[in-house]
Amino acid sequence: MRRRRPWRVTLVPLAAACACAQSSSAAPPAVLSSPADPGTRAFAEALEPRLFEFPRDHGPHPAFRQEWWYITGNLHATDGQRFGFELTFFRVALVPAPDGRVGASPATTAGESASAWRTREIYVAHFAVTDVDRKRFRFQQKLAREALGLAGAQAAPLRVWLDGWSLEEPATGTTGPWRLHAAQPGYAIDLMLEPQSAPVLNGAAGLSRKSEQAGDATYYYSMPRLAVRGRLLRDGQPVELHGLAWLDREWGSGGLGPREVGWDWFALQLDDGSALMFYALRDKDGARDEHSAGTWVASDGSVRALSNADVSIAVTGSWRNRSGERYPAAWRIRVPALALDLSVRPALADQELRTTPPYWEGAVDVGGHRGGETLGGRGYVELVGYAEER
């Protein structure tokens, strides 16, 4: 879930900034645009459940205004050092592509020559590393237009890229393995991801509604267990790593409802092979919105949709950023129907991406029990809407 914003992207600053790939503090595109914007009317909308087809749906969906590929993971070195990472790619369309192709060039008027810089697509990517043992959190954002091959996405074989950052598969017609590349000052990753299970459809057969208004929805699936092996360069020194990652995929053209201002998203991988995803949408008055929802994946692979009423979340700790704004920083999550009772704590307090607006996305530790069985695990949490735009 993304990211994911008070679910709106400001396209004018994005368009002005995208002459080339660059580090940027433009608004994160993990924000969906408002359906009240007349410009969204020509885009397809997520209105009804659809038939998902893999591996095709790992690739882009140009009929929709925005989508993202969101990968997070917890990794360990052979000597026990721990790292977390986030690598995320966002595709935002400025206008619909008339022929349905991502990156199709805008039409030109009579007497006007097309420029190689013209584009219908903007891409933004975030790369963050949590170096738990050294208590470091580093992040970078890049932004580019699709023109001239600066950024883009394709389905066969899967490839999503921006500048030197990429998610790609080596063979056509498969679901993994996938390779991740990204680098920023002090840290770089080269990782292979191997799916351990089939994609999991969230919501109503993959349709995830964000409010009561038609079109305020996305098509949403997850791959909650990706085995990871590869290498991280830290200050130029290689560290061999292994662990688990999580892939989230969403696409749509709508937004949050008018009362919704942010959300808390949990993606938890438990040691018994099960997984829990839940997003808690927050209204202006601080209450949890009724469209909050999630998914439970049992260790045998069976899937259960979770409604807002199924899940109890209590905040048990907090953290303040450099501006004094408070984020929740510890939680107790209970799902009575599953006899599930979990505690969740950040691996590092400061995992805030100080983009515009800022958001917190970080590695967490999980403990608790299900019935009489003790459980542990790791995961990622995303917190949006707690800090002011700057």
Residue ranges of predicted features:
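Hydrophobic helical h-region of N-terminal Sec-dependent signal peptides
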Residues: 12-16
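Bacterial N-terminal signal peptides that target proteins for export
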Residues: 2-11
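Structured soluble/peripheral alpha/beta segments that form catalytic or ligand/cofactor-binding pockets
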Residues: 22-390
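N-terminal Sec signal peptide cleavage junction
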Residues: 18-20
